[in-house]
């Protein structure tokens, strides 16, 4: 068969195009992260779990300021510079120009980031009259739990590229607070378009941000697919596609990692650590955790309103046995809420010893020598601060039984667990925390302040004035030595009042395949992939 020169040329061109397409597909870089669960949603303003932040605020959004990856150092983000007034109450941010928004099938942006987006992102959380305030449940645990509605007097637009925050008082950690996930900046133009279309909740479900990756597809409990954002204002990611393979079981995550079905996994089973250290295909990274695992006592439920009962339950638990069985060498017993690596730590506090007889005596003083029944909520997922909540719950249940307290273990799907706990349905509930900004305020105020007991993450529902009178002045002064002293006193008060059983600080392990380069373990518990490459 003869082929004309014209047809021959077309054939060669076609083959060339095919070859180019194949080459491009071969060169495309995909990284698969075996995540531990499904996100609660894609708007980090509305949620508090690290699982949700990994899937939303980290890849999709930016903040005015950011934490340098792997540190708690605050660096420029969407704001390229800022000034703080002499009285510490006015912060002026100058926005980076040329920052582009993602798009999706429902919305194509017509402008770049400007001050309207910043004002909207904070006004939605602060202002009950904002049309978006109640959309998607309207729960802003961080913003409200940290007392920001009272702290922030006004967020105002100076011009298209300048925004000013006016505070009611100085706030030492305020700049670091703005690098946290709840302070992610959303598009006002997108919000307005979805409100006009009668589908405002799409702002939170189909995210549009300015981050290094944009969302392509989400299948609940299966996978999330992102692509590198070509218009990203920062350094473009070195991978083309990022996939979250949602894998709740740590053993299955490890099996996938070994088969190269994923390249990074979080929260390995402590029992697998020794094997991972011997695995030549894996780089086992580790870091002391800026975290704490604890069991909150709901002081609004009897008999936990009695401090003697809370102390008794604390004395009854053998924490050393828990550290050995649950953490298996990857954690240390905790006596304070903040970890010993954090400034302000009070090492003079004496921990509750394991003392069942003391526990029985305190229960007798409380009129409960015959014991009582109680619920014990166990997390359904692994977290960096608790690798096996079910096992921990069973051990606490057995210890309490020895002093006459009969505990019923309760659990729910993770999102439902958090929702019900926030509503205060529990008597005792396993929780934990990974620091968000390296400041003690992020532990004390976020987890145990009066404001957090109403709307935030204070699952003990503990509002105690002597404690409040220490942590509030500590956040209002920029005198570091004074802050240290106030936080040390706060730890004594918290120890004596026992609103929670403080259990452990864990070591964070991150198994990463050796083909992965540039991955950094983050002290704040996030998983960043924008600077990662694959060989």
UniProtKB/Swiss-Prot annotation:
Molecular function GO terms recorded: dipeptide transmembrane transporter activity; heme binding; peptide binding; peptide transmembrane transporter activity
Transmembrane segments: none
UniProt induction comment: Expression is repressed by the presence of casamino acids.
Residues that, per the record, bind glycyl-L-leucine: 48-50, 383-385, 433-436
Deletion phenotype: Inactivation of the gene results in the inability of a proline auxotroph to utilize Pro-Gly as a proline source. Inactivation of the gene has no effect on iron-heme utilization, but the double mppA dppA mutant is unable to use heme as iron source.
Keywords: Chemotaxis, Disulfide bond, Peptide transport, Periplasm, Protein transport, Signal, Transport
Chief location bin: periplasm
Signal peptide limits: 1-28
Xref: CDD domains: PBP2_DppA_like
Keyword Protein transport: yes
Gene Ontology biological-process annotations: chaperone-mediated protein folding; dipeptide transport; heme transmembrane transport; heme transport; positive chemotaxis; protein transport
Subunit comment: The complex is composed of two ATP-binding proteins (DppD and DppF), two transmembrane proteins (DppB and DppC) and a solute-binding protein (DppA).
Function (record text): Part of the ABC transporter DppABCDF involved in dipeptide transport. Binds dipeptides and accepts a wide range of side chains, including small neutral, bulky hydrophobic, and positively and negatively charged groups. Tripeptides are poor substrates. DppA alone controls the specificity of the Dpp transporter. In addition, plays a role in chemotaxis toward peptides via interaction with the chemotaxis protein Tap.
Domain remark text: Consists of two distinct domains (I and II) connected by two strands that presumably function as a hinge. Undergoes conformational change upon substrate binding.
Record family assignment: Belongs to the bacterial solute-binding protein 5 family.
Name assigned to this protein: Dipeptide-binding protein
Organism (species): Escherichia coli (strain K12)
């Amino acid at each position: 068969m003869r082929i004309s020169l014209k047809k021959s040329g077309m054939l060669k061109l076609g083959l060339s195009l095919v070859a180019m397409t194949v080459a491009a597909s071969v060169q495309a870089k995909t990284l698969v992260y075996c995540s531990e669960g499904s996100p609660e949603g894609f708007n980090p303003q509305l949620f508090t779990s690290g699982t949700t932040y990994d899937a939303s605020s980290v890849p999709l959004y930016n903040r005015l300021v950011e934490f340098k990856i792997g540190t708690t150092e605050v660096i420029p983000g969407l704001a390229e510079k800022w000034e703080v007034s002499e009285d510490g109450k006015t912060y002026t941010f100058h926005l980076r120009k040329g920052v582009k928004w993602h798009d999706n099938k429902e919305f194509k942006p017509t402008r770049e980031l400007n001050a309207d987006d910043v004002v909207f992102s904070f006004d939605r959380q602060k202002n009950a009259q904002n049309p978006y305030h109640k959309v998607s449940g309207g729960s802003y645990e961080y913003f409200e739990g940290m007392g920001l509605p009272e702290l922030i007097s006004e967020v105002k637009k100076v011009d298209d590229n300048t925004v000013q925050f006016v505070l009611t008082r100085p706030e030492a950690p305020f700049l670091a607070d703005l690098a946290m996930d709840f302070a992610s900046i959303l598009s006002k133009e997108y919000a307005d378009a979805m409100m006009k279309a009668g589908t405002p909740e799409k702002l939170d479900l189909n995210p549009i941000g300015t981050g290094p990756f944009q969302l392509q597809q989400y299948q609940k409990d299966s996978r999330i697919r992102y692509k590198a954002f070509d218009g990203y204002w920062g350094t473009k990611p070195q991978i083309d596609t990022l996939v979250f393979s949602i894998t709740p079981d740590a053993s299955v995550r490890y099996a996938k990692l070994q088969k190269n079905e994923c390249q990074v996994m979080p929260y390995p089973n402590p029992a697998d650590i020794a094997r991972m250290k011997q695995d030549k295909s894996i780089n086992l990274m580790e870091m002391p955790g800026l975290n704490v695992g604890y069991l909150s006592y709901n002081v609004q439920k009897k008999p936990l309103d009695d401090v003697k009962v809370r102390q008794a339950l604390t004395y009854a638990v053998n924490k050393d046995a828990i550290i050995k069985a649950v953490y298996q060498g990857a954690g240390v017993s905790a006596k304070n809420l903040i970890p010993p690596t954090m400034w302000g730590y009070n090492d003079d506090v004496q921990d509750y010893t394991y003392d069942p007889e003391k526990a029985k005596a305190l229960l007798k003083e409380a009129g409960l020598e015959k014991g009582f029944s109680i619920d014990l909520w166990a997390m359904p997922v692994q977290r960096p601060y608790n690798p096996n909540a079910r096992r921990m719950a069973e051990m606490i249940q057995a210890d309490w039984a020895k002093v006459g307290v009969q505990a019923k273990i309760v659990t729910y799907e993770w999102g439902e667990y958090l929702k019900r706990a926030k509503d205060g349905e529990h008597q005792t509930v396993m929780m934990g925390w990974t620091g968000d900004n390296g400041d003690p305020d992020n532990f004390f105020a976020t987890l145990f302040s009066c404001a957090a007991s109403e709307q935030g993450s204070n699952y003990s529902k503990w509002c105690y004035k002597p404690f409040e009178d220490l942590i509030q002045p500590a956040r209002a002064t920029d005198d570091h030595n004074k802050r240290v002293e106030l936080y040390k006193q706060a730890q004594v008060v918290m120890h004596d009042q026992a609103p929670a059983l403080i259990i452990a600080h864990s070591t964070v392990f991150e198994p990463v395949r050796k083909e992965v380069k540039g991955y950094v373990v983050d002290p704040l518990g996030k998983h960043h992939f924008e600077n990662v490459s694959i060989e």
